[in-house]
Design a protein with these regions (language model features):
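C-terminal domain-boundary segment and adjacent tail
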Residues: 55, 205-280
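The substrate-binding groove and active-site-proximal loops of carbohydrate-active enzymes
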Residues: 32-40, 63-65, 92-104, 124, ...
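Active-site beta->alpha N-cap acidic-glycine motif
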Residues: 2, 6-82
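Active-site-adjacent pocket scaffolds in enzyme catalytic domains
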Residues: 117, 121-223
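Conserved, mostly hydrophobic/aromatic
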Residues: 16, 53, 86-89, 111, ...
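Metal-dependent polysaccharide deacetylase catalytic core of the NodB/CE4 family, i.e.
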Residues: 56-136, 146, 151-152, 178-179, ...
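Generic structural signal for well-ordered alpha-helices
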Residues: 46-50, 73-77, 105-112, 138, ...
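Short, solvent-exposed loop/turn segments at secondary-structure junctions
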Residues: 18-20, 67-69, 92-93, 131-133, ...
């Protein structure tokens, strides 16, 4: 079990439910070698994450692709049966910035519908693939019946990544005029810039003692939101031939340390799903 002194803390553990070959850095290699998509490792890695959460009694939010329904319906049901929140990650893991209005509407509505039918649970939240959120998507999410978004990542220097152009952005939960809530990912100030500490590659690559100090400050300030991908706890997933040195670092570095890093933050802080916060 985790610590009992932060049961009401606004600390969220979220998972982008994707297989290793769906990572952004892998897409150019997948186009050259489509057979990569036959080497599935999602289920075994996701079950490990579920077991880790269960061992501490925590609930998480799992942002799931609609196209997982069918092959992975039983896995999606398992997430819900273990008391976790199933939210939408879109249908096809396509960046929202590449969609016209009609395609965007279909992605949002169809993923919500198909996931709700699969797990018999209301899908309240959404996260854009690769944090490719847009102002238009915020309005479309409200029209599609979502209650919150979790795609804003207010870091410095990455254009189009977790950013809105005209609508407001903040580092803590806030509400848009259309009623949609936003649960942004956590950043930290480093001089005049905001850098990510919220998970994914950043959680793997930064020195962990430094990260813990920044996380501790975020928790004390009342809001910490971290995310992971199931493949990031799998140091044995396939090594792509011909991968560049930089991409190899980006994708594979510190995979062997990820489970321990998650265990350490689980033992130090309490975590909830976003849905728990909205209904409490």
């Amino acid at each position: 079990m985790g610590p009992d002194n932060q049961t009401k803390a606004m600390n969220f553990f979220t998972v982008d439910v994707e297989d290793w070959f769906q990572a952004g850095v892998m897409q150019k290699y997948l186009r050259l070698n489509p057979s990569m998509a036959n080497q599935h490792r999602l289920e075994e890695n996701l079950v490990v994450l579920l077991d880790m959460l269960d061992s501490y009694g925590y609930q998480g939010t799992f942002f799931c692709l609609g196209n997982l329904v069918g092959k992975y319906t039983s896995l999606l049901k398992l997430i819900a049966e273990r008391g976790h929140e199933v939210a939408s990650h879109g249908m096809t893991h396509t960046n929202l910035t590449s969609m016209d209005a009609k395609t965007l509407e279909w992605e949002l509505k169809e993923s919500k519908r198909i996931l709700e039918d699969a797990v018999n649970q209301a899908v309240r939240g959404f996260r854009a693939p690769n944090f490719s959120i847009t102002d238009a998507a915020i309005y479309a999410l409200g029209e599609a019946g979502y209650e919150y978004d979790s795609s804003v990542f207010p870091i410095t220097g990455r254009k189009g990544y977790g950013k809105l152009k005209e609508l407001p952005m903040d580092a803590r939960p806030y509400r848009f005029e259309n009623g949609l809530w936003e649960y942004p990912l956590t950043t930290t100030a480093l001089g005049p810039i905001q850098i990510p500490i919220a998970g994914g590659a950043y959680f793997r690559h930064f020195p962990f003692e430094w990260l813990l100090k920044r996380i501790d400050k975020a928790v004390k300030d009342g809001y910490f939101h971290v995310y992971v991908h199931p493949w990031e706890i799998d140091e044995k997933h396939p090594l792509v031939g011909g991968i560049s040195a930089l991409d190899r670092i980006r994708h594979y570095r510190n995979l062997d340390k990820m489970q321990d890093r998650i265990q350490q933050i689980f033992s130090k802080y309490s975590f909830n799903s976003i849905n728990q916060n909205m209904t409490s």
